[in-house]
């Protein structure tokens, strides 16, 4: 509204529907889009689509995640390596606060929805790097990192399986909303108040866990509204012929726990 521009919104029902997102990109080109704002579902597959769009002199602004090429004009997203490191730091603090001893065996399970999403891969990388340099020697990451394909039910069954197969699990890192919700559902269903959760994003299920004093949880809240808002402003400028030398813009994150929820209105 602020820019007085016509915006046509299209999306896929499941983040694994990569071909569907490619089809939407092709439709946008065919229908004469002046610019495209894209949250890529796959960092590899969408690279070719972005290249085809830019070959037609149509600017592309990415939000939420980047692609594995330079074929875009700007990208507004979380610094996901930094966010992963923050998540690992928070995990260690919460594990200590929950009474876990650094000399006792302990494991942390990890889930993500896609191992071809640059954003999620970077979150895991940041988490593992911080963990390797700061966790006690007896505390380990479960090597079986689960990929749930954006399916909440699979995320829940994967979390349950990890608990069943790894008796020393005392923590979970959910790298995105789907993974976090699946883990939350498992912890509630199995009443695992002894397991710490560090998640991403803030679904109703996650908020319910954070508000329950019997459970130990925190979530990394991305600023999606800023990604979309700043991305649209940038796209409008590019359509008008303005250029920017900077391509990546970190929109930041907020660590949300029960205290933060009480003190702030988080939508």
Question: What positions do the PLM features span?
Answer:
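Short beta-strand segments enriched in small/hydrophobic residues
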Residues: 1, 8-10, 35, 40, ...
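Short, solvent-exposed amphipathic alpha-helices that sit
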Residues: 1-4, 83-90, 118-138, 154, ...
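Glycine-centered short loops/turns at secondary-structure junctions
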Residues: 2-4, 32, 57
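Short beta-strand elements in bilobed, periplasmic/extracellular small-molecule ligand-binding domains
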Residues: 2-14, 107-110, 128, 132-152
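Hydrophobic alpha-helical segments within soluble ligand-binding/sensing domains
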Residues: 21, 76-105, 122, 153-156, ...
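Hydrophobic alpha-helical
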Residues: 25-55, 126-127, 143-208
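Flexible loop/hinge segments that line or gate small-molecule binding clefts
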Residues: 44-82, 86, 98-107, 203-212, ...
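Hinge/cleft segment of the Venus flytrap/periplasmic-binding protein
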Residues: 105-115, 119, 130-131, 202, ...
């Amino acid at each position: 509204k602020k820019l007085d521009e016509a915006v046509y919104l299209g999306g896929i029902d499941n983040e694994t529907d990569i071909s569907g997102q490619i089809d939407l990109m092709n439709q946008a080109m065919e229908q004469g889009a002046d610019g495209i704002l894209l949250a890529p579902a796959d960092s590899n597959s969408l690279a070719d689509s972005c290249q085809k769009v830019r070959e037609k002199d149509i600017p592309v602004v990415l939000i939420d995640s980047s692609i594995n090429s330079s074929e875009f004009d700007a990208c507004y997203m979380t610094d996901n390596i930094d966010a992963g490191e923050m998540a690992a730091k928070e995990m260690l603090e919460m594990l200590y606060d929950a009474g876990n001893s650094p000399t006792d065996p302990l494991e942390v399970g990890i889930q993500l929805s896609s191992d071809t999403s640059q954003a999620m891969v970077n979150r895991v990388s940041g988490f593992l790097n911080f963990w390797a340099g700061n966790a006690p020697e007896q505390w380990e990451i479960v090597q079986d990192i689960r990929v749930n394909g954006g399916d909440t039910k699979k995320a829940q069954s994967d979390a349950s399986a990890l608990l069943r197969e790894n008796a020393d699990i005392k923590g979970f890192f959910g790298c995105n909303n789907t993974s976090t919700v699946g883990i939350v559902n498992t912890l509630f269903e199995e009443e695992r108040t002894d397991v710490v959760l560090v998640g991403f994003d803030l679904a109703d299920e996650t908020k319910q866990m954070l508000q329950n004093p019997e459970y130990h949880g925190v979530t990394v809240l991305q600023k999606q509204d800023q990604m979309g808002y700043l991305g649209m402003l940038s796209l409008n400028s590019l359509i008008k012929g303005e250029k920017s030398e900077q391509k990546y813009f970190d929109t930041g994150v907020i660590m949300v726990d029960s205290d933060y929820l009480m003190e702030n209105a988080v939508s």
